[in-house]
Design a protein with these regions (language model features):
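Hydrophobic, small-residue-rich alpha-helical packing segments that form membrane-like cores
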Residues: 1-3
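Exposed, low-structure sequence patches enriched in small/polar residues
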Residues: 5-178
Length: 178
């Protein structure tokens, strides 16, 4: 909107990498892919590849002004996305989304300079729908008139799966946790 209360942003990036079979095996074995995992179904290691392509996309909605707060995003990084030539790559093969709502009090009262409370949900999986994170979180903080503050954070994570803890081995179940 023209007041920039609500802002929608997004991006789409593509990548294409080619090279020798040995080079592509190295790319497939990177910690952000682990295509050599024995239980990998979607895009497993292919020793005959001489090129790989992928994409990154993310869309975000943010309510920036006012006391009521909303932030939501959905992002996708395909298993073949490769941008390591630009710097340091630390993820691929991810689908992530979150929704955060909250309320912020900016006007001081008799005790607090400002206060806020946020409740959110997030979920991250890969292209095989191995859920690596799914949970709720609560964040609350207050700032006293003397500029001291207190923050409280808690979260509950549902049972999930790690495809990286064994560094290319089989996936592991992670119990729910607080």
């Amino acid at each position: 909107d023209e007041d920039e209360t609500y802002v929608i942003t997004g991006s789409v990036i593509g990548s294409y990498t080619s090279g020798t079979e040995d080079y592509l095996i190295k790319l497939q074995n990177q910690p952000y892919r682990y295509m050599q995992r024995p239980d990998k179904i979607y895009m497993p290691l292919d020793s005959s590849l001489t090129s790989i392509g992928g994409y990154f996309s993310r869309v975000m909605l943010n309510k920036q002004k006012g006391n009521f707060y909303v932030n939501a995003a959905l992002g996708i990084i395909s298993p073949g996305f490769e941008y390591n030539d630009l710097g340091s790559q630390w993820m691929a093969d991810k689908i992530n989304g979150h929704l955060v709502t909250g309320y912020r009090w900016y006007e001081p009262d008799d005790v607090f300079r400002n206060k806020s409370v946020y409740l959110g949900y997030s979920r991250t999986s890969d292209f095989e729908d191995n859920i690596s994170r799914s949970g709720f979180y609560l964040n609350s903080n207050v700032q006293f008139l003397n500029y001291w503050g207190i923050n409280f954070n808690t979260s509950y994570n549902f049972k999930s799966v790690s495809t990286t803890l064994t560094r290319g081995g089989p996936k592991l179940n992670i119990p729910s946790n607080i």
